Curated annotation (Swiss-Prot):
Gene that specifies this protein: PIP2-1
Gene Ontology molecular functions: water channel activity
Induction of its expression: Down-regulated by chilling.
Protein known as: Probable aquaporin PIP2-1
Organism expressing this protein natively: Oryza sativa subsp. japonica (Rice)
Chief localization: membrane
Tissue: Expressed in roots, leaves and anthers.
Length: 290
């Protein structure tokens, strides 16, 4: 008998013991009353600032690395300098860990339209909140990359502005698949780390939730930087594209929106309807009310 059955079933056949956790009620599709709540706007501001900081630190790291490894600027030993791909991956994963930890109690710490979209599909956030979050994240990303350009104007355009592009030798299908799988890993980790069922049984999990999320971002970057520069976050991609505003940045830009949203949708379906058996529970509820 599986662990879930031990915890949730018992006694005579067909009888179920009280669950040791409580699933939050699904968020309404449209909650007009939410628009009059200060907590919503506070959360939107938190998402804006968090995404701004995320893009500033990470894109600055990318530009700095490319400058340090540019032989024409840093000498013959440039190839041995810089933080390397590992350092870039740590910058992205580390900033997500820090910012999710700081904002989780205010906005949920999404910092990514794909995460927001996945949580919306799972009825964790309302449509109104999801739209405002995504707008705030995109604006924050644009401002964050704008700061990088302001502070590193001599190198920003020279080194590509941190924009996501499909690397030479890879097809559009490969790039799209990399973004789908990478975002699936991230959003699946978000669902698992914030699962109320897990939180109820492991009291330390809520405190550590930002850690696996940040580590997932780190691992995905190691795998996909050579392919797409790693998007998995439409705000990150559009922020760099808008400020760099080069034809190369916009070419195949759709990959960095379609891929993350598809990956997030698959992760939401997998976690909610397969792992958490949402479809079976809904069918059981329908039969009991029939």
């Amino acid at each position: 008998m599986g662990k879930d059955e031990v915890m949730e079933s018992g006694g005579a056949a067909g009888e179920f013991a009280a669950k040791d956790y409580t699933d939050p009620p699904p968020a309404p599709l449209i909650d007009a009353a939410e628009l009059g709540s200060w907590s919503l706007y506070r959360a939107v501001i938190a998402e804006f600032i968090a995404t701004l900081l995320f893009l500033y630190i990470t894109v600055a790291t990318v530009i700095g690395y490319k400058h340090q490894t540019d032989a024409s600027a840093s000498g013959a030993d440039a190839a041995c300098g810089g933080v390397g791909v590992l350092g870039i991956a740590w910058a992205f994963g580390g900033m997500i860990f820090i910012l999710v930890y700081c904002t989780a109690g205010i906005s949920g710490g999404h910092i990514n339209p794909a995460v927001t979209f996945g949580l919306f599909l799972a009825r964790k956030v309302s449509l109104v909140r999801a739209i405002l979050y995504i707008v705030a994240q995109c604006l924050g990303a644009i401002c964050g990359v704008g700061l990088v350009k302001a502070f590193q104007s001599a190198y920003f355009n020279r080194y590509g502005g941190g924009a996501n592009t499909l690397a030479a030798g890879y097809s559009k299908g490969t790039g799209l698949a990399a973004e789908i799988i990478g975002t699936f890993v991230l959003v699946y980790t978000v669902f698992s780390a914030t699962d109320p069922k897990r939180n109820a049984r492991d009291s330390h999990v809520p405190v550590l939730a930002p850690l696996p999320i940040g580590f997932a971002v780190f691992m995905v970057h190691l795998a996909t930087i050579p392919i797409t520069g790693t998007g998995i976050n439409p705000a990150r991609s559009i922020g760099a594209a808008v400020i760099f505003n080069n034809e190369k940045a916009w070419h195949n830009h759709w990959i960095f929106w379609v891929g993350p949203f598809v990956g997030a949708a698959i992760a939401a379906f997998y976690h909610q309807y397969i792992l958490r058996a949402g479809a079976i529970k809904a069918l059981g509820s329908f039969r009991s009310n029939a």
